[in-house]
Regions:
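S-adenosylmethionine
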Residues: 33, 66-68, 72-204
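SAM-dependent Rossmann-like transferase core, predominantly class I methyltransferases
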Residues: 1-65, 72-81, 198
Length: 204
Protein backbone atom coordinates (compact mmCIF):
# COMPACT_ATOMS: atom_id res chain seq x y z
CA UNK A 1 0.00 0.00 0.00
CA UNK A 2 2.72 2.61 0.78
CA UNK A 3 4.07 2.30 -2.78
CA UNK A 4 0.56 2.72 -4.20
CA UNK A 5 -0.15 5.92 -2.26
CA UNK A 6 3.53 6.99 -2.20
CA UNK A 7 3.34 7.64 1.51
CA UNK A 8 4.55 5.96 4.69
CA UNK A 9 4.66 6.87 8.37
CA UNK A 10 7.73 6.73 10.60
CA UNK A 11 7.81 8.11 14.14
CA UNK A 12 4.56 9.94 13.46
CA UNK A 13 6.06 11.71 10.45
CA UNK A 14 4.87 11.32 6.86
CA UNK A 15 7.34 10.40 4.12
CA UNK A 16 7.20 10.09 0.35
CA UNK A 17 8.21 6.58 -0.76
CA UNK A 18 8.41 4.72 -4.05
CA UNK A 19 9.98 1.49 -5.30
CA UNK A 20 13.49 2.98 -5.11
CA UNK A 21 13.55 2.85 -1.29
CA UNK A 22 12.55 0.55 1.55
CA UNK A 23 9.29 1.22 3.34
CA UNK A 24 10.27 2.79 6.71
CA UNK A 25 9.90 0.32 9.57
CA UNK A 26 13.19 0.36 11.50
CA UNK A 27 13.07 -0.09 15.29
CA UNK A 28 15.84 2.52 15.43
CA UNK A 29 12.97 5.02 15.58
CA UNK A 30 12.40 4.02 19.19
CA UNK A 31 16.03 4.85 20.00
CA UNK A 32 15.73 8.23 18.27
CA UNK A 33 12.67 9.08 20.37
CA UNK A 34 14.69 8.25 23.48
CA UNK A 35 17.63 10.37 22.27
CA UNK A 36 19.83 7.25 22.33
CA UNK A 37 19.96 7.50 26.12
CA UNK A 38 22.08 6.76 28.09
CA UNK A 39 24.88 6.34 25.53
CA UNK A 40 24.76 9.58 23.55
CA UNK A 41 26.16 12.59 25.39
CA UNK A 42 26.56 15.08 22.54
CA UNK A 43 24.79 15.30 19.19
CA UNK A 44 26.32 18.17 17.26
CA UNK A 45 26.96 16.07 14.15
CA UNK A 46 24.93 13.03 13.08
CA UNK A 47 25.47 10.70 10.12
CA UNK A 48 23.13 8.16 8.56
CA UNK A 49 24.77 5.54 6.33
CA UNK A 50 22.43 4.11 3.67
CA UNK A 51 19.68 6.67 4.13
CA UNK A 52 17.13 5.44 1.57
CA UNK A 53 14.06 7.63 2.00
CA UNK A 54 15.88 9.75 4.56
CA UNK A 55 13.42 8.91 7.32
CA UNK A 56 16.02 8.18 10.03
CA UNK A 57 18.11 11.26 9.20
CA UNK A 58 15.02 13.47 9.14
CA UNK A 59 13.70 12.02 12.41
CA UNK A 60 17.10 12.71 13.98
CA UNK A 61 16.94 16.29 12.73
CA UNK A 62 13.58 16.76 14.47
CA UNK A 63 14.76 15.20 17.74
CA UNK A 64 18.13 17.01 17.71
CA UNK A 65 17.28 20.43 16.23
CA UNK A 66 20.72 21.87 17.03
CA UNK A 67 22.56 19.08 15.19
CA UNK A 68 23.76 19.02 11.61
CA UNK A 69 22.82 15.77 9.89
CA UNK A 70 24.56 14.13 6.94
CA UNK A 71 22.80 11.30 5.09
CA UNK A 72 24.51 9.19 2.45
CA UNK A 73 23.45 6.48 0.02
CA UNK A 74 25.11 4.80 -2.94
CA UNK A 75 21.84 4.98 -4.93
CA UNK A 76 21.09 8.22 -6.78
CA UNK A 77 17.47 7.11 -7.12
CA UNK A 78 17.16 6.73 -3.35
CA UNK A 79 18.75 10.14 -2.80
CA UNK A 80 16.15 11.72 -5.08
CA UNK A 81 13.45 10.30 -2.83
CA UNK A 82 15.31 11.51 0.26
CA UNK A 83 15.58 14.99 -1.27
CA UNK A 84 11.81 15.11 -1.71
CA UNK A 85 11.40 14.30 1.98
CA UNK A 86 14.04 16.76 3.17
CA UNK A 87 12.34 19.51 1.17
CA UNK A 88 8.83 18.58 2.33
CA UNK A 89 9.95 18.72 5.95
CA UNK A 90 11.75 22.03 5.42
CA UNK A 91 15.10 20.68 6.61
CA UNK A 92 17.38 21.56 3.70
CA UNK A 93 19.48 23.78 5.98
CA UNK A 94 19.98 21.00 8.53
CA UNK A 95 20.15 17.75 6.52
CA UNK A 96 22.80 17.31 3.82
CA UNK A 97 22.45 14.47 1.30
CA UNK A 98 25.49 12.92 -0.37
CA UNK A 99 26.05 10.08 -2.80
CA UNK A 100 28.64 7.85 -1.20
CA UNK A 101 29.67 4.21 -1.01
CA UNK A 102 29.40 4.09 2.78
CA UNK A 103 32.04 6.54 4.11
CA UNK A 104 33.98 7.09 0.87
CA UNK A 105 32.80 10.67 0.23
CA UNK A 106 33.07 11.82 3.84
CA UNK A 107 36.39 13.64 3.87
CA UNK A 108 37.13 17.31 4.52
CA UNK A 109 40.51 18.78 3.54
CA UNK A 110 41.89 15.26 3.30
CA UNK A 111 40.74 14.19 6.76
CA UNK A 112 37.82 11.95 7.70
CA UNK A 113 34.72 13.86 8.73
CA UNK A 114 33.78 12.95 12.30
CA UNK A 115 30.44 12.55 14.03
CA UNK A 116 28.99 12.16 17.52
CA UNK A 117 26.41 9.68 16.24
CA UNK A 118 26.50 7.31 13.27
CA UNK A 119 23.33 5.37 12.50
CA UNK A 120 23.00 2.72 9.81
CA UNK A 121 20.32 0.32 8.63
CA UNK A 122 22.39 -1.31 5.86
CA UNK A 123 21.38 -4.28 3.71
CA UNK A 124 21.56 -7.34 5.98
CA UNK A 125 19.33 -10.04 4.45
CA UNK A 126 21.26 -13.29 3.98
CA UNK A 127 20.88 -15.68 1.05
CA UNK A 128 18.52 -18.08 2.87
CA UNK A 129 16.18 -15.35 4.12
CA UNK A 130 16.18 -13.73 0.69
CA UNK A 131 14.99 -16.98 -0.90
CA UNK A 132 12.16 -17.26 1.64
CA UNK A 133 11.17 -13.60 1.61
CA UNK A 134 7.39 -12.95 1.49
CA UNK A 135 6.00 -11.51 -1.72
CA UNK A 136 5.29 -8.07 -0.23
CA UNK A 137 9.00 -7.56 0.49
CA UNK A 138 10.04 -8.53 -3.03
CA UNK A 139 8.66 -5.24 -4.34
CA UNK A 140 11.35 -3.44 -2.37
CA UNK A 141 14.78 -2.67 -3.90
CA UNK A 142 17.17 -5.64 -3.66
CA UNK A 143 20.11 -3.22 -3.38
CA UNK A 144 18.75 -2.21 0.03
CA UNK A 145 18.17 -5.79 1.20
CA UNK A 146 20.67 -8.30 -0.20
CA UNK A 147 23.93 -8.67 1.71
CA UNK A 148 25.62 -11.91 0.73
CA UNK A 149 25.68 -15.42 2.12
CA UNK A 150 25.58 -14.45 5.80
CA UNK A 151 23.97 -11.01 5.47
CA UNK A 152 27.10 -9.25 6.71
CA UNK A 153 28.77 -7.95 3.52
CA UNK A 154 27.88 -4.32 4.22
CA UNK A 155 27.61 -4.60 8.01
CA UNK A 156 31.26 -5.62 8.38
CA UNK A 157 32.35 -2.71 6.20
CA UNK A 158 30.31 -0.24 8.27
CA UNK A 159 31.79 -1.59 11.50
CA UNK A 160 35.37 -1.54 10.22
CA UNK A 161 35.21 1.92 8.63
CA UNK A 162 33.16 3.76 11.26
CA UNK A 163 35.94 4.21 13.82
CA UNK A 164 37.75 6.74 11.64
CA UNK A 165 34.59 8.87 11.53
CA UNK A 166 33.49 8.70 15.17
CA UNK A 167 34.39 11.25 17.81
CA UNK A 168 36.16 9.77 20.83
CA UNK A 169 32.88 9.63 22.78
CA UNK A 170 30.81 8.87 19.67
CA UNK A 171 28.07 6.27 19.31
CA UNK A 172 27.59 3.77 16.47
CA UNK A 173 24.15 2.18 16.02
CA UNK A 174 23.73 -0.50 13.34
CA UNK A 175 20.67 -2.61 12.54
CA UNK A 176 21.55 -6.15 11.47
CA UNK A 177 18.20 -7.94 11.91
CA UNK A 178 18.34 -11.71 11.60
CA UNK A 179 22.07 -11.55 10.92
CA UNK A 180 22.68 -10.87 14.63
CA UNK A 181 23.76 -14.46 15.34
CA UNK A 182 26.11 -14.56 12.34
CA UNK A 183 27.71 -11.30 13.52
CA UNK A 184 28.25 -12.64 17.03
CA UNK A 185 29.82 -15.79 15.62
CA UNK A 186 32.09 -13.78 13.32
CA UNK A 187 33.31 -11.55 16.17
CA UNK A 188 32.97 -13.68 19.32
CA UNK A 189 35.25 -11.46 21.42
CA UNK A 190 33.22 -8.26 20.93
CA UNK A 191 30.94 -7.21 23.80
CA UNK A 192 27.89 -6.28 21.74
CA UNK A 193 25.06 -4.24 23.24
CA UNK A 194 21.76 -5.47 21.79
CA UNK A 195 18.64 -3.35 22.23
CA UNK A 196 15.25 -4.50 23.49
CA UNK A 197 12.32 -2.66 21.92
CA UNK A 198 8.89 -2.07 23.42
CA UNK A 199 7.38 -1.64 19.94
CA UNK A 200 8.98 -4.74 18.39
CA UNK A 201 12.14 -5.40 16.43
CA UNK A 202 15.56 -6.79 17.17
CA UNK A 203 19.09 -7.06 15.81
CA UNK A 204 20.19 -3.50 16.70
Amino acid sequence: LPYIVNRAQFMGLSFYVDEQVLIPRSPIGELIEGHFSPWLTTAERILEIGCGSGCIAIACAYEFPEATVDAVDISNAALQVAQVNVDRHGLANQVRLLQSDLFSALTLDGSAERYNLIVSNPPYVDRADLDEMPAEFRAEPMLALEAGEDGLDLVVRVLSEAAAHLEDDGLLVVEVGNSQLALQQLFPDVSWIWMEFEQGGDGV
